[in-house]
């Protein structure tokens, strides 16, 4: 059996769009067949039926009314499906044979604009990622606003993932040959639809790129930016089936011109959505976005995502906010005008996409009506930013006048229903309307006349699209109908419908006028739309100014409402905040209940603030607060404090909270270590780093060792030494102040009562002496017997704990000194063994000395160590010889006054293990553990 002719045409179209759900227009319905029908039926919960397709079995089918498609398509697209719309391209009544059909648009997550969405303040980005030699190239576009940008950077995976996290595209295009490992990581960062294309073939020519933009813009592209731009434009043209005129500016940007914030940090700081609810509420954007327009809302989000790092640019924006902040009346008038402005960017996008309607153009006219008022308000401003807005704002008077003269104030819902064009704009429209009006009057007169003639008061003249005009008489009055007066047209259950020759003639006149009027109004509307389309560049420029102005106005309003202050900006590495507050927490609990805190960070004595204190005391909130205040200052916003002087940070990193990646096979601790590793590899001396409870995911001593080692790495690495907030529950680490450069102790103030503690939420100088873990557990409601038993166990453990950080620190310094001697005096592995062995010559007295005394002692003992190295070298050689001969000798090794006798040296593995230990390559805690194990093994040989 063969497929029916219609189904053959369907299969041809489906083969071309096999990665899409095909909406196939049949009459008044979009129909889906086979697998598409099964998918749509499942996802949209529609009834699944069947259709005879010429095969033995009926084809699975489901459908939706064409006028209801707008309600169903968004549900499919948000689930990650692509939808191809196949329309009838000719009138079925005039078609000979199979109706000609074709795909008129492909709707994908990256190209879909839902006018009914409540996310109008969000951008819908489509992104292309390409690799060329040692560079990543990115191009992105929001076709609804006409934005089209490109950038490139070194082939550093983290930079790519950070950019994806920042932009948050709805769809990503990659080359078919992309590295699968990279693809997996992209999916882990942002699980969106990824479309693969062959970038060698799927791209427009350079000439097409120039035609879309300009020769000047395209000639400035490097090859790594040109490739993704060509691919992106190709995909837009392929899905939209047309060239979009609102995409007329190709912007290049550099990622180094904005603060870098990786995906983890964006999530931890809750910049645009809360961690728990994944919604805007509870985020920084929720606090700041009081925008008057949708365009302003999108601008504020961009400013949060891309804080500035150039001092002049930050201060320019701050000065603009300050001027509006200082003039409350000005801002009230400005916001009153801004609230009357619709989303000009997206209306322009609809004009370009040929799907704008009359109400959209009325919204545009209403928006343009407010531009003269806004320009007048800006006339006397003094800041560089606002003066620039005044000088560059185009009032678009000609476009406004065109719309004012042509579009009716109450237009019809559909463009093919008429009632669009104003009276007086077109003479022919006026004449046809007059004819239509007279026709309707004639119909009303006919109805009255026939009622009087027949005496049937219920007689009426009606109309429908199938039968046209008719005279309807109920069956109860059937006997009153004059014989031969009417021609029967239709019989109903309770009535009869008739026509007359006179009515038929008038019907042709009326319907002819209506059809001509509808077609004429539509053609005039298209002319108006095309005239406005010619001014898209001007419209976009004014829309950009309005959106930026709304952003400035909103920042001023938020500052006024929340008692924010203008921060000072410096490049000296100093962050000084007086009475800083967390903008989101303060908004939730109320300003009066929030405890403010001071912060002082620099690149000398307060490089790393070591913050100790119990859980739930507010350490994490304080750390996030410092990061958010820094970010707000660099985006040009006032900040929640009484005073703030902020050093420009090139990057913000955070390691806060516990998480795991079970799907990726990573434990909580593994994820934590991966995040810390990423920070240590990518932070610079100008970065701000927040580390919370490093080492929490493993055993106490392992965690303590890692936390200590990370602090050492940050403070001792001359190429790093970044501003760091390091919160920990290892209160033993407070002794690092004075030992490591730049470490300063702070803690959360706690008021300890008889059986409980009160968290004062105040950050004070000095370290905490205990963790108050049991008190926190009690507050959480653990049973009393569990709490009491925990106290007993704690007392027992504390009695046995002999850990001394000063002792380990001394060992570390001696080890470092020996390492220097070893480098100078020995060049082979045997010398390295001797140098390692020397690490045991530390006595208990030296570990109790002050730091200065320890340093002096180390310096004076260098000569003794050199002699000891020679002596130990000789002894080790003897041991190796004795071992080969299986002779038993005696030798003593001293460690903290402990004597160990090696009487039996037959086991080669002990000597081998001792010779292979690289104790200088271990951190102090690892060195102690290794030494302890070797001593234990040695005892077994006695």
Swiss-Prot record:
UniProt GO cellular component terms: cytosol
Entry keyword DNA-binding: yes
Binding site for ATP: 613-620
InterPro entries recorded: DNA_mismatch_repair_MutS, DNA_mismatch_repair_MutS-lik_N, DNA_mismatch_repair_MutS/MSH, DNA_mismatch_repair_MutS_C, DNA_mismatch_repair_MutS_clamp, DNA_mismatch_repair_MutS_core, DNA_mismatch_repair_MutS_N, DNA_mismatch_repair_MutS_sf
Gene Ontology molecular-function annotations: ATP binding; ATP-dependent DNA damage sensor activity; damaged DNA binding; mismatched DNA binding
Biological role: This protein is involved in the repair of mismatches in DNA. It is possible that it carries out the mismatch recognition step. This protein has a weak ATPase activity.
Stated family: Belongs to the DNA mismatch repair MutS family.
Stored NCBIfam families: mutS1, PRK05399.1
Protein known as: DNA mismatch repair protein MutS
Species per Swiss-Prot/TrEMBL record: Clostridium botulinum (strain Eklund 17B / Type B)
Highest classification ranks of the organism: Bacteria, Bacillati, Bacillota, Clostridia, Eubacteriales
């Amino acid at each position: 059996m063969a497929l029916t002719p219609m189904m053959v045409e369907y299969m041809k179209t489906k083969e071309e769009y096999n990665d899409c759900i095909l909406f196939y227009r049949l009459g008044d319905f979009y129909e889906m067949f086979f697998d598409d029908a099964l998918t749509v039926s499942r996802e949209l919960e529609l009834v699944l039926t069947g259709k005879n397709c010429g095969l033995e079995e009926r084809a699975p089918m489901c459908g939706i009314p064409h006028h209801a498609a707008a309600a169903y398509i968004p549900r499919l697209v948000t689930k990650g499906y692509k939808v191809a719309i196949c329309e009838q391209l000719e009138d079925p009544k005039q078609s000979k044979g199979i109706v000609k059909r074709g795909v008129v648009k492909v709707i994908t997550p990256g190209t879909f604009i839902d006018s009914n969405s409540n996310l109008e303040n969000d951008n819908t980005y489509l992104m292309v990622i390409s690799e060329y030699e040692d560079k990543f190239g990115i191009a992105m576009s929001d076709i609804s606003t006409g934005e089209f940008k490109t950038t490139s950077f070194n082939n550093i995976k983290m930079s790519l993932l950070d950019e994806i996290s920042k932009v948050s595209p709805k769809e990503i295009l990659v080359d078919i040959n992309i590295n699968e490992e990279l693809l997996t990581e992209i999916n882990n960062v942002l699980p969106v639809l990824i479309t693969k294309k062959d970038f060698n073939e799927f791209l427009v020519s350079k000439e097409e790129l120039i035609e879309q933009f300009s020769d000047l813009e395209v000639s400035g592209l490097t090859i790594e930016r040109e490739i993704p731009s060509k691919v992106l434009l190709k995909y837009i043209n392929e899905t939209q089936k047309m060239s979009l005129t609102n995409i007329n500016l190709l912007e290049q940007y550099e990622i180094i011109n904005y603060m870098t914030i990786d995906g983890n940090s964006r999530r931890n700081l809750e910049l645009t959505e809360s961690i728990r609810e994944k919604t805007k509420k509870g985020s920084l954007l929720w606090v700041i976005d009081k925008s008057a327009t949708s365009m302003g809302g999108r601008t504020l989000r961009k400013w949060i995502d891309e804080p500035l790092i150039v001092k002049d640019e930050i201060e320019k924006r701050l000065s603009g906010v300050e001027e509006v902040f200082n003039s409350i009346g000005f801002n009230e008038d400005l916001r009153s005008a801004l609230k009357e402005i619709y989303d000009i960017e997206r209306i322009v996008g609809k004009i370009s996409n040929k799907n704008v309607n009359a109400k959209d153009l009325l919204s545009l006219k209403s928006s343009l009506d407010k531009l003269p008022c806004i320009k007048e308000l800006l006339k006397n401003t003094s800041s560089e930013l606002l003066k620039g807005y005044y000088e560059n704002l185009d009032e678009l008077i000609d476009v406004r006048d065109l719309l004012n003269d042509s579009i009716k104030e109450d237009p019809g819902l559909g463009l093919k229903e008429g009632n669009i064009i104003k009276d007086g704009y077109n003479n022919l429209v006026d004449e046809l309307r007059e004819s239509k009006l007279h026709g309707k009057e004639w119909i009303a007169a006919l109805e009255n006349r026939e009622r009087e003639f027949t005496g049937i008061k219920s007689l009426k003249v009606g109309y429908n699209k199938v039968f046209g005009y008719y005279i309807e008489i109920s069956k109860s009055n059937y006997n009153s109908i004059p014989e031969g007066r009417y021609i029967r047209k239709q019989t109903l259950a309770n009535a009869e419908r008739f026509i007359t020759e006179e009515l038929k003639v008038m019907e042709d006149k009326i319907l002819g006028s209506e059809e001509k009027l509808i077609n004429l109004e539509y053609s005039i509307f298209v002319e108006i739309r095309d005239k406005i389309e010619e001014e898209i560049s001007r419209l976009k420029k004014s829309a950009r100014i309005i959106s930026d102005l709304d952003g400035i106005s909103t920042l001023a309003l938020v500052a006024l409402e929340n008692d924010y202050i203008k921060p000072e900006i410096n490049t000296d590495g100093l962050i000084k905040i007086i009475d800083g507050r967390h903008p989101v927490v303060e908004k939730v609990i109320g300003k009066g209940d929030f405890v403010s805190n001071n912060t002082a960070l620099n690149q000398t004595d307060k490089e790393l603030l070591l913050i100790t204190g119990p859980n739930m005391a507010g350490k994490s909130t304080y750390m996030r607060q410092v990061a958010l205040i820094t970010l707000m200052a660099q985006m040009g916003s006032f900040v929640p404090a009484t005073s703030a002087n902020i050093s420009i940070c090139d990057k913000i990193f955070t390691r806060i909270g516990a998480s795991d990646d079970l799907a990726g096979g990573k434990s909580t601790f593994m994820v934590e270590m991966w995040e810390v590793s990423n920070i240590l590899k990518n932070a610079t001396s100008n970065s701000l780093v927040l580390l919370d409870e490093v080492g929490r995911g493993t055993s106490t001593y392992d965690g303590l060792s890692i936390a200590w080692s990370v602090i050492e790495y940050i403070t001792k690495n001359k190429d790093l030494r970044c501003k760091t907030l390091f919160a920990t529950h290892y209160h033993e680490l407070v002794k690092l102040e004075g030992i490591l450069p730049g470490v300063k102790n702070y803690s959360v103030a706690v008021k300890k009562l008889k059986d409980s503690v009160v968290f004062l939420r105040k950050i004070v100088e000095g370290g905490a002496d205990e963790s108050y873990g049991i008190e926190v557990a009690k507050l959480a409601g653990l049973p009393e017997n569990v709490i009491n038993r925990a106290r007993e166990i704690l007392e027992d453990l504390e009695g046995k704990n002999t850990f001394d950080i000063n002792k380990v620190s001394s060992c570390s310094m001696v080890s470092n000194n020996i390492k220097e001697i070893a480098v100078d005096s020995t060049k082979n592995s045997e010398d390295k063994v001797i140098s390692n062995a020397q690490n045991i010559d530390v006595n208990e007295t030296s570990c109790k000395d002050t730091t200065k005394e320890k340093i002096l002692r180390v310096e004076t003992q260098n000569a003794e160590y050199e002699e000891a190295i020679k002596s130990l070298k000789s002894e080790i050689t003897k041991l190796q010889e004795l071992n080969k001969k299986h002779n038993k000798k005696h030798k003593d090794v001293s460690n903290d006054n402990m004597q160990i006798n090696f009487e039996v040296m037959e086991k080669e593995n002990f000597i081998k293990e001792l010779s292979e230990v690289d104790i200088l390559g271990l951190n102090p805690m690892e060195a102690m553990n290794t030494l302890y194990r070797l001593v234990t093994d040695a005892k077994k040989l006695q």
